[in-house]
Amino acid sequence: MGVVGQFNDLSFDFSVYDMVMMGRTPHKNLMEPDNKEDYEIVHNALKKVNLTTYSDRSYLTLSGGEKQRVILARAIAQEPKFLILDEPTNHLDIKYQLQIFSIVKSLKIGVLAALHDLSMAATYCDILYVVKNGEIVTYGKPNEILTKELIKSVYEIDCEIYTNPITGEMAIAYKMPKY
């Protein structure tokens, strides 16, 4: 199982490459050295998240979004059958948000993700669980459960739900609240 949290601060100064190589640890015995297969897997994981040129950089010098992509690469290097994501696109520019979700979807493994962006969730998730105050309100396919009424009830905000003319996917536009 791989995990990508939303907060990934460290006190130790590891290179990006070493951070991703740590994803190989579950596959090793105590003191077992890295091998050719590990190097290839780490390189491919860095390539997937577009960070191969960052290999020698210090993890501590990276932006929040870059750190998030390193942590995803580390999880990919683990070769998990299941991935837990806690706001995986929290610090990312839009380009990388889309890239991260596309990468995760391409892994074809089980994923449990906590997301607040309902349009992204509707686009990339097969099943949604809508939670309010720690309780499951409803669950199902995004196009079956995400309604204006549900969003108003759970998030206390008005919205319009429409089909994105570019992607053909469900999208949600929120109405600005008046204060």
Walk through the language-model features, giving the residues of each:
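Conserved ABC ATPase "signature" region
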Residues: 21, 36-54
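Conserved ABC ATPase signature
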Residues: 58-62, 66
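Hydrophobic anchor residue at the start of the ABC signature
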Residues: 72-73, 100
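Conserved catalytic motifs of ABC-family nucleotide-binding domains
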Residues: 79
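Catalytic Walker B motif of ABC-type/P-loop ATPase nucleotide-binding domains
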Residues: 83-87
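ABC ATPase nucleotide-binding domains
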Residues: 148, 153-179
